[in-house]
Amino acid sequence: MTKNEDGSRNKETFDLLTKAWRPQKKEEVDINDINILFDDSPDGILAWDVYGTTLFYAANLVPIIADDIVSVDRAMQWGFNWSNGPFKAMDKIGPYKIIDKLEKEGIELPYMLKVLKENNAESFYNDQDEQLSPEGNWISI
């Protein structure tokens, strides 16, 4: 940020391509568009690198540090004020879209995505207040 003689301020950003400072411009990205995770644009690549790796990490936490997916979701919701935990988020995004992207990139599936796929489950939660267990069966929440 630079300060002008009249006291006003200009927000600037360092442009990595030109290696010079330039005025900051507001980027228009629809953060509610979950399809951006699967876009090959710079925005999509960044979104996947940040959020996709978070979901990947979470899908490997069960059963290592948590006994079930609800514990991971609640920890993220209660501890970090997420509106949805990572497993509920994956259900909204579509677990098989994530699986397809990981397989296309040659990445081994994290544990709970493997469980979901091997048991032909469509989601981590169902509409009967049940969750997919690490063993691949439906258990009460």
Task: Give residue spans per PLM region.
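N-terminal glycine-rich phosphate-binding loop for ADP-containing cofactors
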Residues: 1-141
